[in-house]
Structure formats: structure tokens, C-alpha cells
Amino acid sequence: MTHQSDLIAEDIHAYLARHETKDLLRFITCGSVDDGKSTLIGRLLHDSRLIFEDQLAAIERDSQKHNTTDEAVDLALLVDGLQAEREQGITIDVAYRYFSTDTRKFIIADCPGHEQYTRNMATGASTADLAIILIDARYGVQTQTRRHSFIASLLGIRHVIVAVNKMDLLEFDQAVFERIRQDYLTFAKALDIHDIRFVPLSALRGDNVVSPSERMPWYDGPSLMQLLDSIRLDADQALQAFRLPVQYVNRPNLDFRGFCGTIAAGVIRPGDQVTVLPSGRQSRVRAIVTTDGELPVAATGQAVTLTLEDEIDISRGDMIVRHGEPLPLVADRLTVELVWMHDAPLQTGRAYWVKLAGKWLPGRVTAVHHRVNVNTMEREAASSLALNEIAEVTLEIDAPMAVDAYRQCRATGSLILVDRISNATLGAGMIRSAEPSAGIQSEKDAARRWQAFEIEFNELVRRHFPHWQARDMRDWPGHKE
């Protein structure tokens, strides 16, 4: 089952070649405080024989000082690396770990369970394909269980494994497991998650983590590791149309001009006709360039450089799509599910930086439609947002950009709000829908709302540097008072 490292010592090149062809699964572990998330990851790594001898020796030494269990070795210390985490016996930051089996590679994000660190959990979930929701068998479904399940659903995670942990403390009682299973399924009816699996286990003792447990004969399903190894991800990509957000324009000399980025969705080949958004200009792909040479085809997840047949204006943040396929929306008014991540509350009407893929634009939240109570799934009236709160809002940006719905494509349907002074990340948004404002013709003459200091600076430039021939910003097309 688990990946053996003997090949690394014998033939590193053969190991790397085999490793590159494996499927990659990113998953998170989340749940309430002290449900055993870090212990579970430690057990996965330990029982998979993926801990080096020096790591195990270090954990044995640290266990004498920071042990939170009755065992000689506290496996949670493999993941809880911050001093504050070890002293308090909790997870604060998102900890990433890597391992593999014979068929699949894994990236684990161990997310904090405390409510004040929910923003950290949202960060870990933003790139995950699967979520392991841990539930303490003694307490059942808790508030944080609901909160994390809702965030996982909100962030588009399509697969959930509910791991009922600490079954050893309840004598591996089947009735307890079945009750928790039913409670969670009842709650999950309100969530957009269609693949939910359940497994009873003991992370501390190792039951049903890597190998099936002999102490739960009533459970005939796969172990947690077997589930992780077998879940299919090939149907998760909802969008098949080509999307390439431009991250960088590569111009090393006069003879080469390439547009670099990671393909967010779809497939591209030399000769394909493409459209650049939001400008709408068209051309054909001349070549797909990588560090390994030119490719005959490129697909989702590959970092490539496209060269085009025509010299057209393309900048960082523009999107290249394939002609004839469904197009993204080019809009400056978005309906967004927003997770607020800052101590200072959201202020409607205040200007923030909006970052989507490689694009940075000023924008503002103009309305809060409702706040979501993650415990009851009910919508509540709200005019602002506090730390860790989630709401549906209207976000207006100062120029149109090409976007997709988050459910269709994560990379082109997600954004963050950034403070324009401190550059602190304030919130994470998932685009639900988009609509263009009236009068938009192109990005350059899109409606703008100039700030007072920008207009004042423009006046100073025109007064003291008339030879620069600067135009009055208030006369620019689309200016709004």
C-alpha cells in the first residue's frame, strides 16, 4: 500500500520518473478543537513508514516536554511545529506535509480547529480536492464541524471523508458511529457536497488509519488510507474550455514575445485561434514553449509560454481563451461569497485592491446581501462583516475583467481583497455571478471613480508641469463623480 523509498537509494532518476506520473491529491484535515487532526496526520506518516529516523528521534525527545497523550511518542508533534502550538497542544497555522503511495501523491494541509483561526482553515481549503472532517466520537457534530463543512462546500471541495475519531474511548461502539453518521448526513443536506464517506478510527492507536482494524469487525469498509488512494478526481474539473490568465509577458529580445501563465482549464495546441479578454482581440497560437522545448499540446495545470502569430496588446492579468468555446464573463460588477479574514470589519464603499489571477484593480463592496449563519445555514441581514464571517456581497471593480463562476473554475473565479495601505489580505471571495455595467466598451475607458487625492495630484501636475500635457482626469471617459 504505502510507498517504499528503497528505489530512492538505488536509482533516484527512476524514482523521480515514476513519481512524476502519479496522480496528485490535495486534502485538508479539519474539525473541532482537540479532535485529533495533527495526531491523525502523524499516524498516517508513521504507519506509512515515511518518517526518517532523525525525525522520530526528535519527536521522542520533544514528547518528553510537550506530550499531550498517554503514549511515549506524541505523533501530533510531527505537524505542530510552532512553539505556541506545542506549548498549548493546538494547531494555529496551516501545516503542510507530503507523502505518496504506489499510485498517488498527497499534499496534506492540517488546519486549525479554533474559531479564531477559521481564516487559516479557509486558506488551506482553497486548493484542496478533498476534506477530512474529524469528529470526536464522544461529542459528535459540533459548531466547528458545521463551520468547516460549510467552508469546504463554499470553496468547492467535492469530496468529504468524515473520520469519527477516538472510537477507542467508547469501546468501538457501532451505535455511536451510526448516530454520528446520521447526524452529519442530516446537516449536510444543506451543503453542496455530493460525495461523503464515513470511516470510524482511532488516530492514537492506528485503527482504520492505514490498515483495517481488527477491533471493529462490524465495519467492513476501507481504511482511511485506502479511501484516499481510491477516490477519483478526473470528473472534478467542471470547465473544459481553455483559460490562460497571463502572469508575465516575456520579451527577452526583439524576436520573441511570449505570454506566460499556468493553464487554469482546457487544452491548447499550436494553430488554435484564440481571443484575448477583455480587449476581444484575436490571433493564432504559433508555439507552446516550455523549458523542455516546444509542446504539441498543453492542458490544465501546465505552466507554459504561448507565442502568437500577431503582435497584439496583451498585459499581465489579461486572459487568453480559445475561439469557439464558451467565453468567460467580462464584467465589473460581481456577486461574491466573501470570507472576511481581518480584525477590522468590512466597510462598504471603501476602496480595496481586488486581485484575481494576475490582475490587480481597485474595487469596493457596494452592498452586503446577507450574512450566512454557518451553524443553522440561515441567511441573516447584515451591513458589514467581522472576522471569520461569511456573506454574499456585490463587488464593483474599476475596470472590467474576464471571470468565471467559482464552481466552473477556481483559478478564474476566486479573488482576494487587499488593503491599499498596509497590503494586508482582508478577505477571500468566490464569484457566484457577474454582470457588466452599462456603457462599458473596453478596459481603458471603463467607468472609474477617482479618489480625492488622485484628482488633487492630477491638478498639481497640470499646474506645475504644464509641459507634460497631462489631461484633467475629470474629463476622462466614464469618470463618475
Swiss-Prot record:
Residues 31-38 are annotated as: G1. InterPro entries: CysN_GTP-bd, CysN_II, CysN_NoDQ_III, G_TR_CS, GTP-eEF1A_C, P-loop_NTPase, SO4_adenylTrfase_lsu, T_Tr_GTP-bd_dom. Transmembrane segments: none annotated. One of its GO terms (biological process) is sulfate assimilation. Residues 202-204 are annotated as: G5. Residues 110-113 are annotated as: G3. Residues 165-168 are annotated as: G4. Residues 89-93 are annotated as: G2. Keywords: ATP-binding, GTP-binding, Nucleotide-binding, Nucleotidyltransferase, Transferase. Residues 22-236 form the tr-type G domain. Its EC number is 2.7.7.4. One of its GO terms (molecular function) is GTP binding. Pathway: Sulfur metabolism; hydrogen sulfide biosynthesis; sulfite from sulfate: step 1/3. It is an enzyme of class 2 (transferase). PROSITE patterns: G_TR_1, G_TR_2. Pfam families: GTP-eEF1A_C (PF22594), GTP_EFTU (PF00009). GTP binds at residues 31-38, 110-114, 165-168. Belongs to the TRAFAC class translation factor GTPase superfamily. Classic translation factor GTPase family. CysN/NodQ subfamily. With CysD forms the ATP sulfurylase (ATPS) that catalyzes the adenylation of sulfate producing adenosine 5'-phosphosulfate (APS) and diphosphate, the first enzymatic step in sulfur assimilation pathway. APS synthesis involves the formation of a high-energy phosphoric-sulfuric acid anhydride bond driven by GTP hydrolysis by CysN coupled to ATP hydrolysis by CysD. Heterodimer composed of CysD, the smaller subunit, and CysN. This is Sulfate adenylyltransferase subunit 1. It comes from Laribacter hongkongensis (strain HLHK9).
